[in-house]
């Protein structure tokens, strides 16, 4: 992905948002508890920050991303997690982390055409609607906690 492309800007926004305090923890809790796709959660949040509703595209985004996620991203993540704390594999585990992130970049590039949507005002309600569109199984409590962390993060992240 070229850095000057819309995909590159979206990826940069995702990594910046993920680095904000509380965002990673909220996303990983949703991933561990509900099987949420962190990449989709972050992309949905960034689109909401730009005032773009993806509510109508939620099922298509999930369906389009699932084959790559299940065949590439999840196996890399699973192996990396299983190797946590094992002696002598730290460097190899870091390589897996790099591959996992690159696989998520490729997933984002594949999903980018589906992330376009009608413009609206960037509001908390739009953020929650976008998150619900890509992860409808999240409990209301998990959705609220995630939305709060993401909204706090998007205000602090560059471009917020």
Q: Model features per residue range: what roles?
A:
Residues 10-32:
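Short amphipathic alpha-helical segments and their helix-coil junctions
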Residues 5, 21, 36-40, 71-75:
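Short acidic alpha-helix initiation/capping motifs at coil-to-helix transition points
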Residues 25-63:
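N-terminal interaction modules that seed assembly of large macromolecular complexes
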Residues 49-111:
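Structured binding/interaction patches within domain cores
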Residues 1-16, 146-159:
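Charged, compositionally biased N-terminal leader segments and the immediate start
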Residues 27-28, 44, 77-81, 112-116:
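Amphipathic alpha-helical segments within well-ordered protein domains
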Residues 83-153, 157-160:
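A charged, amphipathic interaction segment
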């Amino acid at each position: 992905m070229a850095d000057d492309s819309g995909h590159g800007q979206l990826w940069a926004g995702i990594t910046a948002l993920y680095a904000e305090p509380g965002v990673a923890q909220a996303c990983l809790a949703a991933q561990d508890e509900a099987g949420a796709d962190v990449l989709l959660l972050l992309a949905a949040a960034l689109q909401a920050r730009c005032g773009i509703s993806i509510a109508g595209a939620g099922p298509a985004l999930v369906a389009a991303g699932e084959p790559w996620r299940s065949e590439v991203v999840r196996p890399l993540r699973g192996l990396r997690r299983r190797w946590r704390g094992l002696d002598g594999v730290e460097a190899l585990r870091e390589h897996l982390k790099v591959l996992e992130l690159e696989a998520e970049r490729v997933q984002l590039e594949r999903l980018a055409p589906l992330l376009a949507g009608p413009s609206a005002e960037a509001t908390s309600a739009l953020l929650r609607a976008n998150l619900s569109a890509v992860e409808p199984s999240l409990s209301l409590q998990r959705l609220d906690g995630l939305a709060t962390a993401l909204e706090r993060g998007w205000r602090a992240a560059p471009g917020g």
